C-alpha cells in the first residue's frame, strides 16, 4: 500500500486565492448543482496543478463541499489497484471519488481539469443515439453556432460552424471505476475528443485548464439540450 505522508496535510488545501484548486472545486460543484448536473451527490470534478491532483470526494452533497473536503493525489500515480494511489491528503471519514481512475485517464492525455456530470440532456442524447444508430453510434451535430466552443483537438484550434462535432458514447457499468477501460478505448478511437458520453449515466469532459473544461462542458450541455428539442421537432442533428 502506498505510504501516506500525512492524512491531515491541510496546507495543501488552505489558500485565500479563489483560483486555488481547493477553492475552485467547491465553486464549480455549486455552479454545476445549480444546473442540475450533480444532484444527489452524483458527478464530480478534479484539477491538476503541477504534480498534484485535487479531487472532490465521493458521496458528498456537491453543493456543500468545502476546501477541507478535497482529496490530493501525488501525480503521476497508478490507476489500479486503488491501494496503490499515492494520496498525500485524505480527509477523515470521506471516501475517495470512484471517478478517480477516469480523471487520471484525462490527465494522462494532458488535461488540466476533468468534470463529470449526470446531466439529463447528456443521458437523453445517449438514448436517442442508441435508438437511431444502435449501440455503436456516436453523438453528432453540425451547423450550430455553439459548436465553436469545442476544440478540434490538441493544438488544432476550435471547431467551426460547418464542422460536425462527434462525441463517443460508452456503455455504463455497475461500478464507476469499471468505466475506465472503455473510456480509454474511446479516447484512443477518437483522439481529438474532449468528452465521452456514458449511456444512461452522464458525461466526462476535460480541458487544458479549468476555464476551458468548464466552458466546454457548458457548450456541450447546450448542444445536448438543443439536440433533444430538435429531435422532438423532427429536425436532423447533422445538416446534409
Swiss-Prot record:
GO MF annotation list: methylthioribulose 1-phosphate dehydratase activity; zinc ion binding
GO BP annotations listed: L-methionine salvage from methylthioadenosine
Its EC number(s): 4.2.1.109
Superkingdom of source: Eukaryota
Pfam entry (one): Aldolase_II
Record's keyword terms, sorted: Amino-acid biosynthesis, Cytoplasm, Lyase, Metal-binding, Methionine biosynthesis, Zinc
Active-site residues, Swiss-Prot/TrEMBL: 145
Xref: SMART domains: Aldolase_II (SM01007)
EC class: lyase
Pathway: Amino-acid biosynthesis; L-methionine biosynthesis via salvage pathway; L-methionine from S-methyl-5-thio-alpha-D-ribose 1-phosphate: step 2/6
Cofactor note as given: Binds 1 zinc ion per subunit.
InterPro entries: Aldolase_II/adducin_N, Aldolase_II/adducin_N_sf, MethylthioRu-1-P_deHdtase_MtnB, Salvage_MtnB_euk
Cofactors that this protein relies on: Zn(2+)
Functional note: Catalyzes the dehydration of methylthioribulose-1-phosphate (MTRu-1-P) into 2,3-diketo-5-methylthiopentyl-1-phosphate (DK-MTP-1-P).
UniProt-listed NCBIfam families: salvage_mtnB
The family this protein is said to belong to: Belongs to the aldolase class II family. MtnB subfamily.
Protein name in UniProt: Methylthioribulose-1-phosphate dehydratase
Gene source species: Ajellomyces capsulatus (strain G186AR / H82 / ATCC MYA-2454 / RMSCC 2432) (Darling's disease fungus)
Gene name of the record: MDE1
